[in-house]
A protein has these predicted regions:
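N-terminal ligand-binding/catalytic initiation module
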Residues: 1-155
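Short gly/ser/thr-rich secondary-structure transition/capping motifs
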Residues: 45-50, 237-243, 260-264, 284-285
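Glycine-rich phosphate/diphosphate-binding loop of Rossmann-like nucleotide-binding domains
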Residues: 74, 81-99, 157, 161, ...
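Short, structured coil segments at secondary-structure junctions
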Residues: 99, 150-151, 207, 275, ...
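General beta-strand structural signal in soluble alpha/beta enzymes
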Residues: 105, 131-134, 155-158, 189, ...
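A short, aliphatic-rich alpha-helical micro-motif
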Residues: 124, 182, 250-251, 271-274
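ADP-ribose/adenylate-binding Rossmann-like module
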Residues: 131, 256-304
Length: 304
């Protein structure tokens, strides 16, 4: 049984990867009176007088909402909120297993930015943090920005910042392994959506050489028509030599390739034109090039 079928069977068997468990056993009348009425009225009164006490008297301080609209799930695209639920459950399980943070999946059935923002804002008093997940660009940028302005709890778009942090850490190590100079790198990022743009900005802010963004049409250059606001913004600080062409053109002489796009877009022949290339092919669930193919093309370091 391959990994896909094994995972499907596991999900059928479990009927979901997370559950809500009470932290207070209710075995007696006194237990019930303390956890619920009438005793629960007192913490309610305390919070009503002092809002900050909600983080001490409820689970808010350790509870994160993992929220999607189902428009950019893995590499599957716009598959809808219900189909995004397995990923949201999985992320919640990771929060709990790796950080002991409780998390709750929420899938919003709307593609309207105002509706999504308002919905999340209205439920934000139930949580200590908001983790936005798998929301398509460019809508995701505005949603995160507005929620950060409106909410009094942390708001984090994982596909942007989580991915950027991990990629930067891996690239720093790859630079050491390949003995390249960080400030002189030519880095090609394929995929100019939420993840790609966030990675590009982060690497540029860290001082990584010349970052070249590519999308389905090829290299993105300042002044190009048809760019969305996120692409337009990063075009002013990337592609310093104003190169034009397709992905294959961008990879010639490149020190690093970072893929957050679609499967099988890169060949070993393209890798062979790179400069002792670092290849991070991260299209999910199938990468732009398989690791063995990248190595066969002469890649010096590979991540997937």
């Amino acid at each position: 049984m391959d990994i896909n079928q094994a995972s499907l069977q596991m999900h059928y068997d479990l009927h979901g990867k997370i559950e809500v468990i009470s932290r207070k056993k209710i075995e007696t009348r006194e237990d019930l009176s303390l956890a619920y009425t009438p005793g629960v009225a007192e913490p309610c009164r305390v919070i009503a007088k002092d809002y900050e006490q909600s983080f001490k008297l409820t689970r808010r301080s350790n509870l994160v909402a993992v929220i999607t609209d189902g428009t950019a799930v893995l590499g599957l695209g716009d598959i809808g909120p219900a189909a995004g639920m397995p990923v949201m459950e999985g992320k919640c399980a990771l929060f709990k297993e790796f950080a002991d943070v409780d998390a709750f999946p929420l899938c919003i059935d709307s593609k309207d930015t105002d509706t999504i923002v308002q919905t999340i804002y209205l439920i934000s008093k139930s949580f200590g943090g908001i983790n936005l997940e798998d929301i398509a660009a460019p809508r995701c940028f505005e949603i995160e920005r507005r929620l950060k302005e409106m909410c009094d709890i942390p708001v984090f778009h994982d596909d942007q910042h989580g991915t950027a942090i991990v990629v930067a850490a891996a690239l720093l190590n790859a630079v050491k392994v390949t003995k390249k100079e960080m400030g002189k790198l030519k880095i090609v990022i394929n995929g100019a959506g939420a993840a790609g743009i966030a990675i590009g900005k982060h690497l540029i802010n860290m001082g990584f050489g010349n970052v070249i963004m590519c999308d389905i049409n090829g290299i993105i250059c300042e002044g190009d028509e048809g760019l969305n606001p996120g692409q337009e913004e990063i075009s002013h600080i990337s592609n310093l030599n104003h190169e034009h062409g397709k992905l294959a053109d961008a990879l010639k002489g490149a020190d690093a390739f970072i893929g957050v796009s679609r499967p099988n877009l890169v060949t070993k022949e393209m890798v062979s034109t790179m400069n002792n290339g670092i290849v991070f092919a991260m299209a999910n669930p199938t990468p732009e090039i398989m690791p063995d193919e990248a190595l066969a093309g002469g890649a010096a370091a590979v991540g997937s």
